[in-house]
């Protein structure tokens, strides 16, 4: 019997001025996303992923401790609890990117994964934390992830998460494949002029190299007063052959929906035996910061 799964992505602009009280910003963004989740449900989506740090702006464009107030515990926090109810209502798996507080002063860029019956399955914490031009000052806000590369067994399929800047590192994408992922979601916040030319290269390459589907999500619009640039949207799904099968616009709030045939994974892997032909015993330099020179010295 074919394993077809209807999946959805939500890309959205910031709802309120960044100068408004944080509680108002959070409420406005959650209300906006709840309406879009309803749209995804009407389109019969079974698995849904929201964008990176979905309930606020991309505040990493500045270094300001004010934004620490957006943190919450996972899964005990209000956003995860709310989305558990929403997931159960719609019988929908939801990937929920939040700003997580582990303890005061220790924060993570996190995605909670909720099954279609509302059960919290676990979380992924972003591993690779950028601090670079034109305004990605994430080391001020986030501790590097410490939970590995989990794959979540949901009602509809095996789901992995790789957040934004993670996508530039093929190692974790490969581990997600080895861990059994069928669909990998990459919730992001990325702007034109820096990595847009990579947007449709890297993640289809991950899909091909690892034989799984990828859902890539980016927000839209500009967020003042920061001059980081335009978030260019263009959220998409691609299949294990690296083909983009549906893609959103670059400037509109959208719910992107695609039917994914999970049987394609086995079809592709019967042709391209990348997992069989791996040579992990030769990859020692990948586990050292200095690469081949350090491995040779050992």
Q: Model-derived features: where do they sit?
A:
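Short beta-strand segments enriched in small/hydrophobic residues
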Residues: 1-16, 23
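Acidic/histidine-rich helix-loop elements
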Residues: 15-27, 137-138
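C-terminal beta-strand edge segments of enzyme domains
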Residues: 218-298
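Short beta-strand scaffold segments in enzyme catalytic cores
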Residues: 96-98, 110-113, 150, 235-237, ...
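Short, glycine-anchored, charge-dense loop/turn motifs used at functional sites
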Residues: 7, 113-121, 238-246
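Active-site catalytic loop in hydrolytic enzyme cores
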Residues: 72-75, 85, 102-182, 192-205, ...
């Amino acid at each position: 019997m074919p394993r077809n799964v209807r999946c959805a992505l939500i890309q959205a602009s910031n709802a309120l001025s960044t100068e408004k009280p944080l509680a108002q910003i959070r409420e406005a963004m959650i209300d906006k996303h709840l309406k879009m989740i309803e749209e995804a449900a009407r389109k019969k989506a079974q698995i849904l992923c929201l964008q990176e740090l979905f309930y606020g702006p991309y505040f990493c464009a500045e270094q300001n401790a004010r934004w620490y107030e957006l943190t919450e515990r996972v899964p005990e926090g209000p956003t995860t609890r709310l989305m558990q109810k929403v997931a159960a209502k719609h019988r929908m798996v939801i990937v929920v990117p939040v700003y997580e507080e582990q303890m005061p002063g220790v924060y993570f860029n996190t995605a909670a994964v909720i099954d279609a019956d509302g059960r919290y399955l676990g979380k992924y914490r972003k591993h690779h934390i950028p601090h670079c031009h034109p305004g990605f000052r994430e080391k001020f806000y986030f501790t590097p992830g410490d939970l590995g590369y989990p794959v979540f067994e949901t009602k509809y399929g095996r789901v992995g998460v790789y957040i934004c800047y993670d996508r530039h590192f093929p190692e974790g994408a490969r581990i997600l494949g080895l861990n059994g992922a069928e669909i990998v979601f990459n919730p992001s916040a990325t702007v034109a002029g820096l990595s847009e030319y990579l947007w449709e290269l890297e993640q289809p390459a991950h899909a091909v190299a690892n034989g799984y589907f990828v859902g890539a999500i980016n927000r839209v619009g500009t967020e003042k007063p920061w001059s980081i640039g335009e978030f260019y949207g263009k959220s998409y799904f691609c299949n294990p052959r690296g083909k983009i099968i549906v893609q959103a616009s670059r400037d509109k709030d959208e719910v992107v929906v695609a039917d994914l045939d999970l049987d394609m994974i086995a079809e592709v892997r019967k042709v391209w035996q990348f997992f069989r032909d791996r040579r992990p015993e030769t990859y020692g330099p990948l586990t050292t910061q200095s690469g081949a020179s350090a491995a040779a010295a050992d």
